[in-house]
């Protein structure tokens, strides 16, 4: 009798858990790039990578210009693979802003000296707060910001040939 109660209770618990997980899987992915697009860039205060002085986002991002915000770290292997694409974008009609994410400043400087610095401005994000405000969940992540200061494209993971071409087409 006691075993029968445990079996019935276990079966009911299994069904309950199955229903909860099934319902959870039916919800849209909150991390989907499409859902996080079309929002204005948030206002924030950061530190300049080189001078360590406070910088306001409103002083960096001006209406009328395209910006590519790239969140990177020296310890990030995929960041190395996307770096040649960023170097190529440096000479286009877009301002590249790098956000150095939870990194050792000396290691980050070695990274840039070794691979080149594609950024017109680099901000330090030692605690990861700015990246989270932008909607990033890791590195590398890249955001294309239009002339109205609205995020129009989010790239999760390294920039590749396909995403590079898409960026170039969007800023034409």
Regions found by a protein language model. Give the residues of each.
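Thiol/disulfide oxidoreductase modules built on the thioredoxin-like
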Residues: 113-118, 125-171
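Short alpha-helix adjacent to the SAM-binding motif of class I
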Residues: 81, 88, 106-114
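Conserved redox-active cysteine motifs that mediate thiol-disulfide chemistry
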Residues: 71-88
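Hydrophobic beta-strand anchors of alpha/beta hydrolase catalytic cores
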Residues: 68-69, 96, 142
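Thiol-based oxidoreductase modules, predominantly thioredoxin-like and allied folds used
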Residues: 94-107, 119-128
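Short pre-active-site segment immediately N-terminal to redox-active cysteine/selenocysteine motifs
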Residues: 65-67, 71-75, 138
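N-terminal targeting signals for export/organelle localization
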Residues: 1-47
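A short beta-strand-turn-helix
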Residues: 45-67
């Amino acid at each position: 009798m006691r075993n029968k109660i445990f079996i019935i209770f276990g079966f009911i618990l299994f069904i309950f858990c199955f229903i909860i997980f099934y319902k959870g899987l039916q919800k849209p992915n909150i991390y989907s790039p499409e859902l996080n697009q079309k929002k204005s860039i948030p206002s924030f205060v950061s530190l300049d990578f080189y001078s360590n002085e406070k910088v306001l986002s409103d002083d960096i991002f001006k209406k009328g210009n395209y910006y590519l915000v790239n969140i990177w770290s020296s310890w990030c292997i995929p960041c190395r693979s996307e770096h040649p694409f960023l170097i190529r974008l440096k000479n286009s009609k877009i301002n590249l802003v790098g956000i150095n994410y939870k990194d050792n400043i000396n290691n980050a400087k070695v990274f840039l000296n070794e691979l080149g610095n594609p950024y017109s401005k680099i901000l330090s994000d030692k605690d990861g707060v700015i990246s989270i405000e932008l909607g990033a969940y890791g590195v590398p992540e890249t955001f294309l910001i239009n002339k109205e200061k609205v995020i129009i494209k989010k790239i999760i993971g390294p920039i590749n040939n396909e995403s590079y071409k898409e960026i170039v087409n969007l800023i034409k």
